[in-house]
Amino acid sequence: KPGFMYHQIKEDKQLTYLLKKFNYSKYIYTNATYNHANVVLNNLHIDYLFSKIYSRDTIPSMKPDINSAISVEKNIRLNTNTSTNHEYYFFDDLLENLKTAKERNWITIWISPNFEDKYRYPYLDYAFPTIKIALIHLHKII
């Protein structure tokens, strides 16, 4: 099995534009390592758009463990110096992670080529085939 081809990850100006249109704090929440997420964001030239990376080596547990989501919420509240409830828009390709997110009352967005099957999963708020299409549609709503 060949290694991950980081050099093939290049800037996507449309993705950058779409992310910039959302004037909200953005976070990466991944089961990958911090270094993996950081290298990908840097290669895409979008690292500066994210406030923090939550990764397998920076939080106590991984998705879909509900304690993982709780620790991310607590850290965001701590870092934003607020106790008020935040609205979390959570994008993921794995249904089990989205199910846990819905248990935390997060707004769930499934990114999958099977997005048309959304109706089968009551814990999904939205479903799109790609992150860019999701951002285009969600910008009209939020």
Describe the residue ranges of each PLM region.
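Asp-based, Mg2+/Mn2+-dependent phosphohydrolase catalytic module
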Residues: 34, 38-142
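Small/polar loops that bind or transfer phosphate-bearing groups
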Residues: 28-29, 92
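Short, acidic loop-to-helix structural element flanking the phosphoryl-transfer center
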Residues: 2-28, 34, 38, 66
